[in-house]
Design a protein with these regions (language model features):
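General beta-strand structural signal in soluble alpha/beta enzymes
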Residues: 109-114
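Glycine-rich phosphate-binding loop of actin/hexokinase-like ATP-binding domains
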Residues: 127-179
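A charged helix-plus-loop insertion that forms the helical arch/lid used to bind
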Residues: 81-91
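ATP-binding/phosphotransfer module of carbohydrate and carboxylate kinases, centering on a glycine-rich
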Residues: 1-66, 77-80, 99, 103-107, ...
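Anionic-ligand binding patches
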Residues: 118-120
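A short acidic/small-residue loop/turn micro-motif
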Residues: 33-35, 91-92, 159-162
């Protein structure tokens, strides 16, 4: 039996997983925080240690590992294995991460946008009967991944679906639909920067300020999604990432906004749902990426 290692690098955390080549989960590490480390090299060394410890914990040989797949925030260059100038992971600006991980771990390493891999994992695990599936990740940033006819849509240069970096009202799209938006709005209304979890707690306790925050968040996300729906007309939109836990707080205003601007949503049965698997989908997508390249 062969195995595949996956690494999910977010804007603030990273963790690793081991799967069989048939995509069955073997082991998942705990999340580690990027802010605990001072430099790029320190983070990479921590990732290497996390992966080696996980491999040792399940007692498998590296000769039985097919490869390692990394999901990281874009924009990046998957063919060269380079993380480019991503606003949510500045410590890795223009960094050839696959070269260093391959060298340090002695495992062939490949990378793609984490939202692409999330979308691929969602398609594989939940929506394989559908031809066009959009994955949306809500967290430190706002990521999009698109599956068309069983494959990740990468565009002509490998950098498609970076819609989160597009102009949107005051700033760029992702700044109006990410964790930073929740923190900024809570500072405006409460006088302090609250975590999304705390605002969600207030929301469920009937707090009006929390309702205002998530209502506006949902409207912003709905406008962004309406643009994407009008361009690609997906059958499925699966929403993941840390903020997807608050889906019931913002979904109503999100859908209302989509109905205003997206004819296809009103005419067709486009499914918009919270991912049941979240980070697991990204890891499975990373494993499938390795299989596609190596097999």
């Amino acid at each position: 039996m062969k195995y595949i290692v996956s690494i999910d690098i977010g804007g603030t955390t990273f963790n690793s997983g081991i799967f069989t080549d048939s995509l069955n989960q073997v082991a998942i590490s705990k999340k580690d925080k990027i802010r605990f480390y001072k430099s790029k090299n320190d983070v990479v060394d921590a990732i290497v240690k996390q992966v080696n410890d996980l491999i040792d914990s399940v007692n498998i040989s590296k000769t039985d590992i097919l490869g390692l797949g990394v999901g990281a925030p874009g924009p990046l260059d998957p063919k060269k294995g380079i993380i480019l100038d991503t606003p949510n992971l500045k410590i890795f600006k223009n960094y050839h991460i696959t070269y260093d991980l391959t060298k340090k771990l002695r495992i062939d390493t490949f990378i793609d946008n984490d939202a692409n891999l999330f979308a691929l994992g969602e398609w594989l695990l939940s929506y394989k009967k559908n031809d066009i599936v959009l994955g949306v990740t809500l967290g430190t940033g706002l990521g999009f991944g698109l599956i068309i006819n069983n494959q990740i849509f990468t565009g002509g240069n490998g950098m498609a679906m970076e819609y989160g970096l597009s102009p949107f009202e005051w700033g760029i799209a992702e700044k109006n639909a990410c964790i930073e938006f929740i923190r900024n709005k809570s500072e405006d209304l409460y006088g302090e920067r609250l975590s999304p979890v705390k605002v969600e707690e207030f929301y469920h306790n009937g707090d009006e300020k929390a309702k205002i925050i998530y209502n506006e968040f949902g409207k912003n996300l709905g406008k962004v999604l309406s643009h994407v729906i009008n361009m690609i007309d997906p059958q499925i939109i699966s929403i993941g990432g840390g903020l997807s836990k608050a889906f019931d707080c913002f979904s109503k205003s999100m859908i209302s906004e989509i109905k205003l601007y997206s004819p296809s949503y009103n005419v067709n049965q486009i499914i918009i749902a919270r991912s049941k698997l979240r980070e697991l989908s990204t890891m499975v997508g990373a494993c499938q990426m390795v299989k596609n390249i190596k097999e």
